Amino acid sequence: MLCSCGAEKNLKKAEKYLALGEYYDAATQFKQAYTKTSPKEREKRGQYALKMAYCYEKTNSVQKAVAAYRNAIRYNQADMNHRLAYARQLLKTADYKQAATEFKAVLDSMPDNTLAKNGLVSAQNAPQWKKEGSRYTVKRMDVFNSRRAEFSPVLAGDQYEKLYFTSTRNEAQGNELSGITGTKPGDIFVSEKDDKGKWSKPEVVEGGLNTEFDEGACALSPDQREMYLTQCQTDPSYPRYAQIVTSSRADASWGKASLLEITRDTLSSYAHPAVSPDGQWLYFTSDMPGGLGGLDIWRVRLTSAGLGGVENLGEPINTPGDEMFPTFRPNGDLYFSSNGHPGMGGLDIYIAKPDKSGHYVLEHPGYPLNSQADDFGMTFEGVHNRGYFSSNRNDGRGWDHIYSFENPEIIQNVKGWVYEQDGYELPAAQVYMIGDDGTNLKLSVKGDGSFEQVIEPNVRYIFLATCKGFLNHKEELRADKTEESKEYVLQFPLASITAPVLIDLSLIHISEPTRRTPLSY
């Protein structure tokens, strides 16, 4: 009798935490309720196990989630949706054989279920994908990592000498542990690379950017003067949802972040911002109504007057599963992570490349960029296919860490410099790039007056540099096909419209005046 009363007390606490989205605390209470309940009360035990499994999923405690689902199945409390969730967790443990068995059982009852279909494809093909491998190489970057979590790296600086990322390490602000994750709330940290290429010890970003709440998954505008980031506030009385906030940089310091109101829907989450290379669109993750299920990737236009309308990216990017962490390669390729497409388990990274008609074509980059765990948050070192990403592979606690990646490839790119004729850089300039293959881009200029862009062989390009107060400057370029990477350098010295221009009058011929009749006007 005493055990039963104790279990009810734990259950009441667990349901309260669950309603607030505090999954770590909820899982702890559900586990205690489960332990205090007699095995003879099979229905109760099975229901508690289901709640535990759901909370463990949310906190990335994969092995605990698998064990909880097995208990729910043992007590005959798991329906086919629970069996589907169990199978998807098995993928994350690389137990592909058992996962395939579960997916087949689900498909016997729900033959049209997209997640079960894609899950079975994953379970049947992942071992071969891992065996085949790819040209990617990955390496764990311990210089950035701690005994807690680090994720969503973002390279910054004119020479990509800064790396921003989120971490829940001890140096993060706040003293209380999060009821959602069981760790300290995350803060934005930064590491800087010296002239010898050595990265410094990460430090929390000073100023008003970080708070006692969770800050994470940041992105920068093309001019790197605006930061978009995810913030998760908490409240003991009602659930709070992730939101996107913005911070402006004054000199070297980031200011206090302010809310970016994407819609007036306060019951949906908005997270994982990414800015398109042309600076015209903000991509983000949300569970707002109108999606394909789970978390979807959306976008909203950025204008001088504010935000435009919101668009769901739709198929083939979004699925009934979760699509998250959009990022861009400078060439316009969209990278994102999903657990709804066929993959190796957990969140896999996918590449969405627009074809000539503007529709996206998806590519799975394979192993080792992807693994059975969660892989996400790509950032690139300029035009090169190298940089950093985050993954919780090989971490028993499910915590994310930062890895480097590189995929050697033949790249032809142009690097340009826009400056005054006197020599000073013009970071306020814009460069328009037009190719005879239909290319029509507006390129942003960095703080040192430079820009970079990948180009295709056998295409004739025209580059036009413009800046308020200066005359335009045009350059033309055509790159031949080559067997190795090559960089073309273009110079754009702009003349001021106020600077005096010397004219040699001896070169001007003045003819005799002609008498005009009224009809000649």
Where are the predicted features?
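Short, conserved micro-motifs composed of acidic
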Residues: L20, A85, K92-K97, D108-W417, ...
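Canonical positions in the second alpha-helix
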Residues: A33, N71-A72, A105-V106
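Short, acidic Ser/Thr/Gly-rich low-complexity loop/linker segments typical of extracellular
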Residues: D436-S450
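Residue-level detector of conserved catalytic or cofactor/ligand-binding positions
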Residues: L505-Y521
